[in-house]
């Protein structure tokens, strides 16, 4: 019986390693598309921030309008109404709501970046894209506003990975310039993952 358990454990380990190897091979084939799709830049120009105001991602916080504790699944960038909003990675527009309350988000854009990533841009004043449209990193997709359940002009930005909201701050380097980011991405594209 002990030998069968050991063989079973070995078979499971080999299976997991083969799945991981298959994923690595697929990643290698798709690395350029992945590097362009993963949300990785600031959704607004940092110089547009009011007093460097960035509201935190939080599992629980006091909602400023509703007055009770609930999750805050994104981060908020305090800025003037009309500030340009950029796609943070290559994607297809899944939702572009140019009117309505939309569950408190107001006017919003939801981008599908593939590879399990989506990003949401909410409380917009103006939506500049349409569902089904392909957008590229750095493209202006909207302008900030104060629509929906909001206390003032800002951008609410979410990163959703495999259906779960994750902290967007982990997806961009606050000190990295666009040029530095492009150099990093170029180095990643030149890396041969098949030899790792």
Which positions does each model-derived feature cover?
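Non-catalytic extracellular/periplasmic "stalk"
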Residues: 1-53, 57
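Catalytic cores of peptidoglycan-degrading enzymes
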Residues: 46-194
């Amino acid at each position: 019986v002990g030998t069968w358990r050991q063989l079973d454990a070995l078979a499971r380990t080999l299976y997991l390693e083969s799945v991981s190897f298959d994923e690595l091979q697929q990643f290698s084939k798709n690395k350029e598309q992945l590097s362009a799709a993963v949300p990785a830049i600031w959704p607004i120009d940092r110089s547009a921030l009011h007093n460097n105001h960035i509201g935190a991602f939080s599992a629980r916080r006091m909602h400023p309008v509703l007055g009770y504790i609930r999750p805050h699944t994104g981060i908020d960038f305090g800025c003037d109404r009309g500030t340009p909003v950029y796609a943070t990675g290559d994607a297809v527009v899944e939702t572009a709501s140019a009117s309505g309350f939309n569950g408190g988000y107001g006017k919003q854009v939801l981008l599908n970046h593939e590879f399990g990533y989506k990003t949401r841009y909410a409380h917009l004043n103006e939506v500049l894209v349409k569902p089904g449209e392909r957008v590229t990193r750095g493209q202006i997709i909207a302008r900030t506003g104060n629509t929906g359940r909001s206390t003032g002009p800002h951008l609410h930005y979410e990163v959703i990975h495999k259906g779960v909201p994750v902290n967007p701050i982990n997806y961009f380097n606050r000190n990295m310039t666009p040029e530095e980011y492009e150099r990093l991405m170029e180095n990643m594209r030149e890396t041969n993952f098949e030899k790792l």
